[in-house]
């Protein structure tokens, strides 16, 4: 009698491990194989942008070793292992020359940092921080240094600016935009967040891009496209993430911005699912924890034999910028409204109302974040 094919989950980040936990509550017997390109330690990715202010190294942010996770989940976990191919027609994957069969396959391999082309002889001093191993490398490089240039003024860029500044570093932020968190924040809220970070000593250079990075004595010189030269010791790249889709595309799965899945988290091929940062769920690619958790619960049910679809209710995002606390909930797609700004300084309530006067989105800064629970009750779901 042949051995049962396992559920295979590629990825051991928040998406992979949370799905495995939820599924094991429903099915304790079916074999489970998890495969990861990194070291397999369990950690919370959002905590990567809090490590310096809390003075935590990578080991301090890790919550469990892969061996402990394997025991907890009754799973086999392959670390530092790259899947090289997917064969949907025969329900198998390839790890080099090794064939691994699956009952169901879940792609939870996340997103990768967007790489920016930079001239100069110091490109090795440019660090993305997208996982625990990236964080460990950067923290080692940052030891004894003080001047950090940060590329990107989006959500993650602002969180790292707050964290590194609170951790004692001198921060310069460079981004080719007119405000922080463009596309996410109303300009008034963006101005409040920027003011809060400037209060920590963060310097913003909005508009230009980093043209070249050159070694200069014991440090570096960052040459911006507008001619400004900023002395620094190392550079953090936080210009954004791109869902990993290449392997899925090569296997014939439908991809768009992310791997295309329906509300059951099913891809265009039977028995293959995706969730987390790599997935585009019914047209939405949301790189946040709340949607991921909702998807993990729904997919666990489906994989346990109880077909389920995910629904997104209101999903406000709490941004970790203590210099100016921020909670934001953009209006759902297809909904338009008028923005109104109340408050002053860094304490703003910025509401978006539709033509009937209903609140469909908000940005709350400073003391106004205390109103989030009341406002959340008024919000429409992102994907009902």
UniProtKB/Swiss-Prot annotation:
This is Rubredoxin-NAD(+) reductase. SUPFAM superfamilies: FAD/NAD(P)-binding domain (SSF51905). Gene3D superfamilies: 3.30.390.120, FAD/NAD(P)-binding domain (3.50.50.60). The lineage of its organism: Bacteria, Pseudomonadati, Pseudomonadota, Gammaproteobacteria, Pseudomonadales. GO terms for molecular function: flavin adenine dinucleotide binding; rubredoxin-NAD+ reductase activity; rubredoxin-NADP+ reductase activity. FAD binds at residues 12-15, 36-37, 45, 83, 159, 277, 289, 320. Pathway: Hydrocarbon metabolism; alkane degradation. The gene is alkT. The keyword Flavoprotein applies. GO terms for biological process: alkane catabolic process. Transmembrane segments: none annotated. It is an enzyme of class 1 (oxidoreductase). Belongs to the FAD-dependent oxidoreductase family. It comes from Pseudomonas aeruginosa (strain ATCC 15692 / DSM 22644 / CIP 104116 / JCM 14847 / LMG 12228 / 1C / PRS 101 / PAO1). It holds the Pfam family Rbx_binding. It catalyses: 2 reduced [rubredoxin] + NAD(+) + H(+) = 2 oxidized [rubredoxin] + NADH. InterPro entries: FAD-bd_OxRdtase, FAD/NAD-bd_sf, FAD/NAD-binding_dom, Rbx-bd. Keywords: Cytoplasm, FAD, Flavoprotein, NAD, Oxidoreductase. It is found in: Cytoplasm.
């Amino acid at each position: 009698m042949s051995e049962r094919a396992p559920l295979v989950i590629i990825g051991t980040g928040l998406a992979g491990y949370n799905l495995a936990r939820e599924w094991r509550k429903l099915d304790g017997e079916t074999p489970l194989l998890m495969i990861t390109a990194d070291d397999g330690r369990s950690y919370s990715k959002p905590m990567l942008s809090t490590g310096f202010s809390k003075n935590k190294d990578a080991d301090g942010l890790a919550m469990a070793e892969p061996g402990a996770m394997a025991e907890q989940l009754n799973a086999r976990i392959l670390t530092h292992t790259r899947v090289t191919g997917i064969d949907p027609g025969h329900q198998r994957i390839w790890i080099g020359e090794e064939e691994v069969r699956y009952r169901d396959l879940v792609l939870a391999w996340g997103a990768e940092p967007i790489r920016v082309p930079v001239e100069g002889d110091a490109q090795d001093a440019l660090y993305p921080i997208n996982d625990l191993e990236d964080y460990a490398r950067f923290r080692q490089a940052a030891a004894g240094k003080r001047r950090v240039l940060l590329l990107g003024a989006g959500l993650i860029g602002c969180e790292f600016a707050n964290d590194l500044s609170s951790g004692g570093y001198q921060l310069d932020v460079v981004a080719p935009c007119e405000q922080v968190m463009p596309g996410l924040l109303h300009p008034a809220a963006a101005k409040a967040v920027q003011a809060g970070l400037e209060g920590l000593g963060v310097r913003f250079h909005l508009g230009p891009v980093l043209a070249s990075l050159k070694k200069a004595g014991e440090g570096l010189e960052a040459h911006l496209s507008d001619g400004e030269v900023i002395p620094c010791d190392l550079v953090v790249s936080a210009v954004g993430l791109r869902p990993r889709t290449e392997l899925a595309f090569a296997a014939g799965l439908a991809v768009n911005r992310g791997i295309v899945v329906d509300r059951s988290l099913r891809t265009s091929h039977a028995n293959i699912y995706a969730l987390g940062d790599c997935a585009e769920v019914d047209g939405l690619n949301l790189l946040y924890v709340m949607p991921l958790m909702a998807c993990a619960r729904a997919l666990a049910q489906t994989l346990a034999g109880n077909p389920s679809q995910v629904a997104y209710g209101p999903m406000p995002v709490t941004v970790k910028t203590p210099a100016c606390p921020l909670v934001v909930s953009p209006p759902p797609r297809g909904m338009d409204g008028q923005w109104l700004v109340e408050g002053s300084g860094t304490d703003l309530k910025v509401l978006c109302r539709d033509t009937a006067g209903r609140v469909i989105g908000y940005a709350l800064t400073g003391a106004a974040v205390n109103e989030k629970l009341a406002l959340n009750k008024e919000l429409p779901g992102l994907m009902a």
